[in-house]
């Protein structure tokens, strides 16, 4: 049976880092929707948003999500993938959704530590910590609704991977 594990959460929560490590441990393929979008368009998220707006970007993001058809795979999604009810239903129906939860303070710390990795334009134009807190507050219910499992992403990536494995395979962890 084909198994997809969808990593959801805010920008900077570790979806790509944790997803890659989890895929290695499980022997699954790894896919990142932002990377797939870049490969299919030749444009960064910021470039797509500048040309097509957030609505155009979200439509492309949904197309990319539904194109993930490879066998067993861990899929790191964009932070806003859950804004679409269709995307939430698709992920829940096609696999297991893991929400990597972190506080606004932790996300801000990570994004400041690796500014070159943050290629997304601001959603609100506000200072980073304010924007993160506002976006988290607006999306929390949707992340929770999408998720089969919610994990604390403030731990080191290997610890988060271990926690995910314990949630997915509780009998193997005992």
From Swiss-Prot:
Q: Domain text from the record?
A: The LID domain closes over the active site upon ATP binding.
Annotated CDD domains: SK
Instruction: Name the gene that codes for it.
Output: aroL
Q: What biological processes does GO assign it?
A: amino acid biosynthetic process; aromatic amino acid family biosynthetic process; chorismate biosynthetic process
| Principal localisation | cytoplasm
Comment on bound cofactor: Binds 1 Mg(2+) ion per subunit.
| Enzyme kind, highest EC tier | transferase
**Which family does the UniProt entry place this protein in?**
Belongs to the shikimate kinase family. AroL subfamily.
Q: What are the subcellular locations of this protein?
A: Cytoplasm
Q: Which residues bind substrate?
A: 34, 58, 79, 139
- The entry marks the following residues as binding Mg(2+), namely 16, 32
Q: Know the name of this protein?
A: Shikimate kinase 2
Record text on subunit structure and interactions:
Monomer.
The UniProt record lists the keyword ATP-binding: yes
Cofactor names: Mg(2+)
Region annotated LID domain sits at: 112-126
Q: Name one GO cellular component term.
A: cytosol
